[in-house]
């Protein structure tokens, strides 16, 4: 696992109901499945791209 300096916390704030299947898959890739869940991920360009794809469903809680 990466050190704490390269981690980002993401919280799901929106429902994937009636969303495109690719947006649902992106939430699964971000390890999110219910509103209010928070996950800590490595801060990489790939993860940032996934967050940008579903920016209306998630928010960044903490950037270290």
Curated annotation (Swiss-Prot):
One GO location term (cellular component): cytosolic large ribosomal subunit
Entry coiled-coil feature ranges: none
Origin: domain of life: Bacteria
Stored InterPro entries: Ribo_uL30_ferredoxin-like_sf, Ribosomal_uL30_bac-type, Ribosomal_uL30_ferredoxin-like
GO MF, one example: structural constituent of ribosome
One family name in Pfam for this protein: Ribosomal_L30
GO-annotated biological processes: translation
CDD domains assigned: Ribosomal_L30 (cd01658)
Keyword terms of this UniProt record: Ribonucleoprotein, Ribosomal protein
Entry's family note: Belongs to the universal ribosomal protein uL30 family.
Subunit structure of this chain's protein: Part of the 50S ribosomal subunit.
The protein's name: Large ribosomal subunit protein uL30
Organism in which the protein naturally occurs: Rhodopseudomonas palustris (strain HaA2)
Lineage summary: Bacteria, Pseudomonadati, Pseudomonadota, Alphaproteobacteria, Hyphomicrobiales
